[in-house]
């Protein structure tokens, strides 16, 4: 079974979100997503300063098995991207909830986080 941290929020496209103390939101792909993808060999991230709509494509993950789009789970402005992933895309496999994060976003509306799945709902979604 996949590791599903209780403190995070989730969406059905297999991204996780963590609300930070400064009000920003860190986004990455779930352990379940990286297990399905297999060994990740390339990650394309959004540009810092980009304004993304909810469910807009924010990047791409390529693995030995497939390429998959990464979506922005809430609307907002990209504040930072994880540049470590450019040289070490395998961090998304080895530490999906830590060093393998994808980008940070300033939410257009913090209330958007309220409609997202908690860990229990995500576990049910993926049959864990």
Curated annotation (Swiss-Prot):
HAMAP family: GcvH (MF_00272)
One GO BP: glycine decarboxylation via glycine cleavage system
Superkingdom of this protein's organism: Bacteria
Entry note: cofactor: Binds 1 lipoyl cofactor covalently.
Pfam families per UniProt: GCV_H
CDD domains given in the database record: GCS_H
GO cellular component: cytosol; glycine cleavage complex
PANTHER family associated with the record: GLYCINE CLEAVAGE SYSTEM H PROTEIN (PTHR11715), GLYCINE CLEAVAGE SYSTEM H PROTEIN-RELATED (PTHR11715:SF3)
Function: The glycine cleavage system catalyzes the degradation of glycine. The H protein shuttles the methylamine group of glycine from the P protein to the T protein.
Cofactor: (R)-lipoate
Protein name: Glycine cleavage system H protein
Subunit structure and binding partners: The glycine cleavage system is composed of four proteins: P, T, L and H.
Similarity-based family: Belongs to the GcvH family.
Domain Lipoyl-binding: start-end pairs: 24-106
Keywords tagged on the record: Lipoyl
Record bears the keyword Membrane: no
Family matches, as PROSITE patterns: BIOTINYL_LIPOYL, LIPOYL
Native organism: Chromobacterium violaceum (strain ATCC 12472 / DSM 30191 / JCM 1249 / CCUG 213 / NBRC 12614 / NCIMB 9131 / NCTC 9757 / MK)
InterPro entries associated with the record: 2-oxoA_DH_lipoyl-BS, Biotin_lipoyl, GCV_H, GCV_H/Fam206, GCV_H_sub, Single_hybrid_motif
Residues found modified as N6-lipoyllysine: 65
